[in-house]
Amino acid sequence: MLAARLIILLSFYWLSASAIDPADPLFVDLPHGKIRGRDNGFYYSYESLPYAEPPVGELRFEAPQPYKQQWTDTFDATQPPVTCMQWNQFIFGDNKLAGVEDCLTVSIYKPKNTSQSSFPVVAHMHGGAFMFGEARQNGHENMMREGKLILVKISYRLGPLGFASTGDAGLSGNFGLKDQRLALLWIKQNIASFGGEPENIIVVGHSAGGASVHLQMLREDFAQVAKAGISFGGNAMDPWVIHRSARGRTFELGRIVGCGQASDSMELKNCLKSKPAGEIVSAVHSFLVFAYVPFAPFGPVVESPDAPEAFISQHPVDIIKSGKFAQVPWAVTYNTEDGGYNAAVLLEKQASSGRELIFDLNDHWFDWAPYLLFYRDSMTTIKDMDDYSRKLRQEYLGDRRFSVESYWDLQRLFTDVLYKNATELALDLYRKHGKSPVYAFVYDNPANTGIGQFFAKRTDVHFGTVHGDEYFLIFENLARGPEMRSDEEIISRNFLNMINDFVLSGNGTMTFGNCVLQDNVGSNKLQLLSITKNGCENLQLESFP
């Protein structure tokens, strides 16, 4: 079904070419009608363009349907994209519900660069653990100032609305991933109308956005919608990506919102369709052990082979081993202290006690660690789980207690288990089973302020190079300070040039500054580019440092 839809959608592409009015580039003709964008000084924006029918009512918990409406009046594309409904950890107070259910849009940003008649295209997947976040959480002014690329930001369903699954054909799941897929089809079909080059599309994302890029690339037909992908700080191997116990969690969701009488998946889905969306999303609170842990109670699943329009029906490891995935260039990254994203929240002083949560780990390690590190559902018995918890603590902390002084080793544990080990695993699989180039880099250059300080609400701790420190040099984010150091300005420009050159490369080569990244496919050793404030260096490794 998805392949047939692709053929139908792409057949409209030629109708949309050269649709910008040369007399007024704010107006663009699309198959649905005319739109009006905004002049932002050094770039144009065309925001909140629907790519799917609203996923409400009978379309809730279903694969997205292509947008069908025709506009009789000019569509106002000057409004920023709305937030997809979510339980957002960044909202203070007890009620963290935000957003709306009707949110499936793309937003397009085009630089004013008269020296280019057309532009390569970056399709952007935002992060947020598949639970929260939004298209506008990352800025675009750095990319627009460079003037070389068109940027398209994708909004997709999140949390239970995007990823509830009973593991069978009745309520298959992965609706957020299917949204992303349909958005990529829309971009391929329509981007020429904005001066974009449909033959030069690269998909990038960070964290869950990076994992989304990888999951999209595990479909063999990805090559029909994009030329390459970059997964920053997240990939499909990460333990928080593929969920193993979605069925029980989804039936529990039903019980919480008053659908406990449902005896099968279809009955549960029909009942959930009748409930207010806000009630369903607010139920996320009931799945949290403390604070926002686990940070991803709902997420991607391996669908049943008989599921309608299944996105993936094998585990990512098995897909890669089979060789049946898109053979297009891919890059994957991690930061030296990525785990600070998850660990730093434990350093915030609690209003009730005046001390940090990290001290509570001494009494609750065996209860909390499986949720913090996402192995609760992968262990067969409680004993297996406790043994693994004990092993991790001994390996990283020895006999020391959890405290502010031992934070560095705790974040190292989080970095390894949640990010670094999975990146190494992905590279190892691709070098054995891949055919197109696969690259990797590690970033080690702490921001003055970043996610570590943001979550811990303190600056007296050295957090290192935390999750997002590299990505926010490309796409601005409020979690870090707005100013860049001189070394970060150079790195930012190198990243932007890297993306531009990667998508335009005829043979999939990738460069950063004066360094040429080395291909892992077929290599006897892991090829990893190290990026620091002092430059870049190619490393050949038996295993990651």
UniProtKB/Swiss-Prot annotation:
InterPro entries: AB_hydrolase_fold (IPR029058), CarbesteraseB (IPR002018), Carboxylesterase_B_AS (IPR019826), Carboxylesterase_B_CS (IPR019819)
Gene3D superfamilies in UniProt: alpha/beta hydrolase
Disulfide bonds: 84-103, 259-271, 515-536
Keyword Signal in annotation: yes
Presence of keyword Zinc: no
GO terms, molecular function: carboxylesterase activity
Annotated keywords: Disulfide bond, Glycoprotein, Hydrolase, Secreted, Serine esterase, Signal
Glycosylated position list: 113, 421, 507
Name of the top EC class for this enzyme: hydrolase
Cell compartments where the protein resides: Secreted
Name of protein: Esterase-5C
Entries under CDD domains matching the protein: Esterase_lipase
Protein family per UniProt: Belongs to the type-B carboxylesterase/lipase family.
GO cellular component term of the entry, any: extracellular region
Documented EC number(s): 3.1.1.1
Catalysed reaction equations from the record: a carboxylic ester + H2O = an alcohol + a carboxylate + H(+)
Active site: 207 (acyl-ester intermediate), 467 (charge relay system)
Signal sequence bounds: 1-19
